Amino acid sequence: MSAPKNEMYYSLLEWFKTLNLNAPHADAESLADGVALAQALNQFAPESFTDAWLSKIKASAVGSNWRLRMSNLKKVTQSVYDYYSDVLNYSLSDFSKPDLQRIAEKCDLGELERLLQLVLGCAVNCAEKQSYITEIMCLEEELQANIMRALQELEATRQASTPEGGVASSLSRGSRTGLLDSKAVQEDRDALAQKCFETEKKMLLLIDEKTNLQQELHKLQQEFARLEQHSTVIGDDGVSLGPVQTGSVRYNELRRQLDLLKEELLQSEGAREDLKIKAQQQDTDLLHMQMRIEELMKSSAEVTTLKDEVDVLRESNDKLKICEAQLDTYKKKLEDYNDLKKQVKILEERSADYVQQNAQFEEDAKRYANTKGQVELFKKEIQDLHAKLDAESSKNVKLEFDNKNLESKNLALQRAKDSLLKERDNLREAVDELKCGQLSSNTALTGTTVSRELQPSATVEKLQRLEAENKALREGQGGQTALAQLLDDANKRCENLREQLKTANERILSLSHASQSDDPILKESEFGKQIKQLMELNEQKTLQLEEAVTQSTSLQCKVTQLETNLSAREQEILVYDAKYRKCVEKAKEVIKSIDPRIASALDASVLEKSADLVEEEPKPKMSVMEEQLMTSAFYRLGVNAQRDAIDSKLAILMGSGQTFLARQRQSAPRKSLSAMKSK
């Protein structure tokens, strides 16, 4: 797996950005001076990277001076290598050391990647490594994979074991718990394959070395045998060394060479044993690696199967949600259907009540039609009586006014009489007495006539009788037109009473002015009586006016109530007509579905009946509905009878050419018309 260019650097930079540092560390230029790296190392391991060491890093006045950057980076890298070798017991001999000059001069991303890789190893091997590992696991999956690969490359160069068992193993354990996905497993498998390849290469090199050593040993043995066979040997200077005897120079020289060769042989055998042990260890490691690869393959297969199962469960969960939503909608529809059933029952009960009410209303209308004539006669009589009452009241007012004028004249004559009585002599007493008698008789006659005219007992009784009759008519009358006419009459009466009240007030004012213009001492008592009488009449008329107003308001309320009831009943009748039409249309559709010929005949009959209904007088709605229901029932009965006849004929035809048992096995025909009629 070859990663894209500088992908690991950007992943390490994203991890480095998560650290809380004072120095800027967002890009390559800010990391090239080594200040941010030194602060990070001080944060990871303050016991190794002390504050005194951090003070040696020149943070200020670095700028673009690459030599100062170079010195800072040298201090950082040297301290990091010392930390790996002394504290972590790591050998970084196989790890390529970053080129600090390229980092200082050009901010090379590849070299910065290796330097950040070393800093990452310090972070995940410090005392607080668990917190940094959890921070790495909080990153995105791609970043985690790249960081894991960087740690594995760093782990591959390790030469000595640590008590913790390695950073990659600890991080792999964490990744098993937190990053169990196919991508991480694939990367682990690639890393293990790389390790296996490297171990195989090392094993081949060791085998080559072993063969070379065996060849050299064989050559030495051959040379030793050759030297033992020859008695005389010529040395390097061309001088014969003599025979090989104990104690001779040649013997000693050969003994020394033999000892050296034995030591070399022992060393080569020890190296061979070491190589064997290493080869065995590498074979065991290879087997472990292969087993681990197989386990990882199994885990990846399990992961894929689990993913497939998760996808299946998701699909089933989505289907379950859809089914639950459909179930909720069906429940709501069922509840609505039950509510509609209840409403239909209520409407059927109401329709039955309305049919009864309509029948009662038709009976009431028939009864009220007979009383309309009587009401009109009573209205005419009431109007005539009101006109007579108005004429008599106007006459009464005129007579009262004339009576008052006569009384004023009478008082004036009495005063004149009293003055004349004092001046007359005793001789004219008889004449005066006769005259006074005549005057008294005239006044008595006029007083009796006036009193008779002023007595309102007959008119009052007549008025009371008319009002009682009017009330009785109002209580017995139920029609709207009669109430409206009574209301108009009452309004007219109120207007007449108001006009009479105005005239009475005008008379009172005129009389009060007249009383003020005459002698107040003599006329005070008489005018007071007249004023009291007029006030009493005024109060009576105001009471009558108030009663008439209350009656008119009550009549208006009744009229409004009757209008509202009438409008409501008209609306109900319209609703029932619409329902009836819908029912008739449905019946037509049903009949058409049964037999179109009967439907056409039914349409023709309905058209004829509609024409007859138009020509004839309008019938009541209930009778029309009954006729229509009877026709629909008759046609339905005819359809059923025709169907039964056809079924019986078919049964006869099918059973004619069969045996008795075969006819018994045939399905029985439908019920006959007589059975239906009996039901």
Curated annotation (Swiss-Prot):
It holds the Pfam family HOOK. GO terms for biological process: cytoplasmic microtubule organization; cytoskeleton-dependent intracellular transport; determination of adult lifespan; endocytosis. The keyword Transport does not apply. GO terms for cellular component: centrosome; cytoplasm; endosome; microtubule; synapse. Residues 1-155 are annotated as: Interaction with microtubules. Disulfide bonds: none annotated. Keywords: Coiled coil, Cytoplasm, Cytoskeleton, Developmental protein, Endocytosis, Endosome, Microtubule, Synapse. Belongs to the hook family. This is Protein hook. The gene is hook.
